Amino acid sequence: MKTMMGIIFANIYDKNMGELTYLRTMASVPYGGRYRQVDFPLSNMSNSGIRHIGIVTKEKYQSLMNHIGSGQEWDVDLEEGGLQYLNPFAMGHDNGGSDGRYRGKLDALKCAMSFLELSKEDYVVLVDGSVLCAMDYREVLKSHVESGADVTVVVKDGICDGQREVDMAVRLDEMGKVADIACNYAAPQGFYASAGAFIISRELLMEKVQEAVARDRYHLERDLVMHGYHKDLKINAYPFAGVALYNESELE
């Protein structure tokens, strides 16, 4: 049986949200009164049987920690596995900058290398805290394994319109295979937008993170997925059919 662990990136798009994230991370922005945005990826992981989760933080994460606590509400406060906060200072990383904080998702994962090395799961689910949806990662893993791909990207149609820039746009051929990938692109209709969720084997992730950061490449979408697609990685796309809310700007 293939096993999964999860990593949530908590600070995605903080700078785009104005005063909403002045004192908190994007993941801890309130939703529906008592809830926070991080509840969505945490619940998705818990409901998918994932009990080993790391939350990557960058700054202003006290309210996030206060809300999540030990993770008991999501059944991840277990002695084996459980939940771990991966902040840049606790990870002991010095990137030569003014404050030692990571420069991109791959840099953050390089900081968290010991977390990955000490884990036992076969696959890692990497998720942004900015896309709100109900998703079963077991179905994504099934698609990933059956495809024989190195990386699976969860994608959503109806987002790309030629005007709105997305982190990653994916074009599929008539067989549903990935035909093109572009990053930071206002892709036209017909492209799928990344839903901020990826599956990759733990061993391959560690290998590719080390390779990328050693070459000053720090961005997951651009430097691992897109660069890998154009070089040597097989990329699979999993079209998500459910409803998803993309929280990327205070103007939306």
What are these regions (language model features)?
Residues 82-172, 207:
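Conserved beta-loop-beta/alpha segment of the NTase-like Rossmann-fold superfamily
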Residues 141, 174-252:
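Catalytic-core segments of class I nucleotidyltransferases/pyrophosphorylases
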Residues 1-32, 43, 48-50:
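N-terminal nucleotide-binding beta1-loop-alpha1 segment
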Residues 71-73, 168-175:
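Short, hinge-like loop/turn segments at secondary-structure boundaries
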Residues 28, 170-172, 237:
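A structural signal for short hydrophobic beta-strand segments in well-ordered beta-sheet cores
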